[in-house]
Design a protein with these regions (language model features):
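Short hydrophobic/aromatic patches at helix-to-coil boundaries
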Residues: 1-4, 94-100
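Amphipathic alpha-helical interaction surfaces in cytosolic regulatory modules
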Residues: 22-96
Length: 100
């Protein structure tokens, strides 16, 4: 699992790759921690190379979404594979996020 966070053009861009499983969640959460603070910046989460997401990974994304909504910003999931989208569908989270 690799998680990277950058600020580009006034918004955050998080890139996730590999497997966001329970073992990787702590590291990913530490990298993405700034996104869980209300700051008013929109967030793009690039998932092109994300191969797997566990419930602990979903918990991190929900935390990011809650913080964004509290500050009036939005979270956009980008380039999400069909397999990962199916996880969002099965958990009922598909309608919570914007997908592009």
């Amino acid at each position: 699992m690799n998680a990277e966070l950058k600020e580009i053009d006034g918004k955050y861009v998080a890139t996730l790759s590999g497997e966001l499983d329970t073992a990787a969640a702590t590291t990913a959460e530490e990298v993405l921690k700034p996104l869980m603070q209300s700051n008013g910046k929109d967030v793009d989460i690039e998932c092109k190379d994300l191969e797997y997401i566990a419930s602990s990974g979903l918990r991190i994304l929900i935390g990011i979404l809650k913080a964004a909504k509290a500050s009036g910003s939005k979270v956009t999931m980008r380039n999400v594979s069909d397999d990962i989208q199916n996880v969002f569908k099965l958990t009922g989270f598909i309608n919570l996020f914007d997908f592009e």
